[in-house]
Amino acid sequence: MAALSLYFLVFSGPSPRLHIVPYTKGGNTVKQGSAKDTKNNQHDEKPLSSTRPEDVALKPDPGHHHEEPTGTRAGWEIDIDDLTYWSDPDDPETNDDVLPGYETDGTPREAGDVARLQHEKDLRKMWRYAYKTTAKLANSNLVYGNTLNQLIQKDNRTEEQSKCLREDPNVKFKFNDDQPVRFNPYPDYNGDEWKKNGHGPYVPCKGPTGEFVEDLLVFRGRPARWPQTKFGGYDLFGIDPNLCWERDSRLGQYGLQEMKKKVGGSYKPIDWDNVNWGELQKHCLKQNAARFDMTMSKKNPYLNNYTENHQKATRSEYIKTEAPKIKGRSIGAKQGQITKESRTALLLRSYTGMKYTDNDRQVIRALVSELSLKTGGQYEVFLLVHSKNQSLPIFDDDELYQTVLKDNVPAEFHGMTVLWSDHQVWDVYPALTDEYARAVHSAQWLSVQKFSQDHPQFDHIWNWEMDFRYTGHHYDLLEKLSAFAKKQPRKYLWERNERYYIPEYHGDYDTSFREDVAKKRGNKTVWGPPDLPFVKPVGPKPPVASHEEDNYEWGVGEEADFISVGPIFDPVDSQWIISNHVWGYSDENHKSTDLPRRTTIVTQSRISKRLLDIMHVENLRGQHVASEMTAQTVALLHGLKTVFAPHPVFMDRDWKGGFLNNWFNPGPDGESGGRGSPFGWGRERRFQGTTWYYRAEPPNRLYNNWMGWVDTNIGGIDWEKKHGRPCLPSVMLHPIKNTQPTKPGHKSEFELAIG
């Protein structure tokens, strides 16, 4: 089978000689060399190719793809004709339901119909083949089973990263010979640099033990078998890749281990139900009030952006408008003058009826401690809880509000919880009349917008999903993401945002990747907002008329209005299932579906008050797009800065960079959106083996094992006695479901409606 070996050569390292086990439709094994040919019934097996991996990964498409015209496909490295007699016994899809034609033949089709085209079915089969037949390779599944016993590169870090670590002779763990060190990623509060920059005095805050919050513990080194990143990288953010986090040292002080508090003359175990995290945060902020602008005006500066004349504003009128000044952003300060620091709210998105596991509670405690208490109030953590029962008038009855709160939120978090309901936000946005448009699935930002209008003291808000876990330090992560976004130039930024950054394929982020994007996009770039008669942009004016006059300078040092942790792609023609969910944004010359828009899968993101303010105004007008598109699209329309921060993403297969680029950035200019997008209906199985997506297998498996729970024959007490205590580098994991001890034989599964 000619191409059966070709795709294997997309793996890193030496070309493997493989024992390939194809399957027939009945699930029976076909011996190698006996696959049948349609003309001769059988043919001799062709020899493995001697082509180098790097050549194959980058070579043009060698395959045939059933009616898809030349020039509209990426190179897939697998020839579908060679898979005629291979089938996956776990694949319920048949060839009975096939529509004629191809995606680019001009026939209007819904996403579900595109998925029924033969070309799409072929792609799904090719990916299943690639993923299935590599499961047992020596360089597959290296993300699993890593422990403290395997650590290497323990002292390999920059001088700046070394400053964050300190020995603690009082710490002893019996499960490992090496002992962890303290990790402190915070500024040198009240030091010379702190004072030089004009900051107010920092006051340390106490936690639930009655003592100052202690720095986290972490082990130096990384597991020897742990793979390299496939998307993104640590070096982009300055995050230390050679640290390994173990569960007891990471979550012990948040309740995974018994914590004690001094009561009278003795220490007693903490009763977490008697802790009030809301009060702890408020008291901490009060102690540090001099550092922050506590009296920010509640006025939204854009409420009068659209008068009858403004709606007819031309682009020339727009570019004369200055962006509103944001207080407290000066780098230094005059002697005796305090530079006010910005504040960020973190909203944990929850709902009534959610059952909080012990792990959920430990992670929430970690967020409050690391982001709010340790920073003296720079961050504040809230539970934003959707009261789903629309018949309960909780805002008309204080007693009912408290009842709903007590019945649905652990006592320790009552003081940091904000309830909201559908009717509450619908009353704010009466122009949104379509029932589907204003439902929480399509309009999850409405509650965040209302929160921002009610709490204007926050310059930024993190929209935080409850099924997200970060094994590393939360403050280290958020500050590094923010700093990365701030230094990004606007030139070709939207175009960099719309693709996965694959280090092995793209090279250095700030040089070769940037140059590659510029070469592929040329003049097809976003430079300021689109010219639309029904949108009056509020963002800053480009400093020069054309991107060609800018040397990657505009935007450097500018805070991002939106930070995503996934590509910000163009959903048009992507076959993403809700790409056309647009309401309003039209006139007699523009259909709603003609609106330029962008989206990101998974809404974990940071958003500025400026962007939330104009989103609020657009929704007041009845202009709306689906949740995953909302912030990105409004930012595009208003000329605001958005950044995709390519955090490290790992995979359970050692795919070559060129292979990954073909499957995950298949657009004509190397983007992840548009035709062939991996986010399209029926294509998302490609994410099965990644550590970050809205459906993926490794996140739950890794987290279960890390917590000491059995999953897919790894983890648990007996396994750890033999192999050691699991540890993980700093890695973002999503989705994480059902964070509680598993039963023997448990296996996390990956399910899709199609694919």
Question: Language-model features: where?
Answer:
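N-terminal signal-anchor transmembrane helix specifying type II single-pass membrane topology
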Residues: 1-38, 43-56, 60-69, 78-81, ...
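Well-ordered, non-membrane alpha-helical segments in soluble/globular domains
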Residues: 356-370, 398-402, 442-446, 477-478, ...
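Short beta-strand-to-loop acidic/aromatic patch adjacent to the donor-nucleotide binding site
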Residues: 457-467
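Catalytic core and acceptor-binding pocket of nucleotide-sugar-dependent glycosyltransferases
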Residues: 8, 20-23, 473, 479-485, ...
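Terminal low-complexity segments of carbohydrate-biosynthetic enzymes
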Residues: 675-755
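Active-site-proximal specificity loops/subdomain of glycosyltransferases
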Residues: 390-457, 475, 482-505
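Long, contiguous juxta-domain segments that are non-catalytic but functionally important
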Residues: 5, 146-147, 151-346, 350, ...
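Short internal beta-strands
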Residues: 380-388
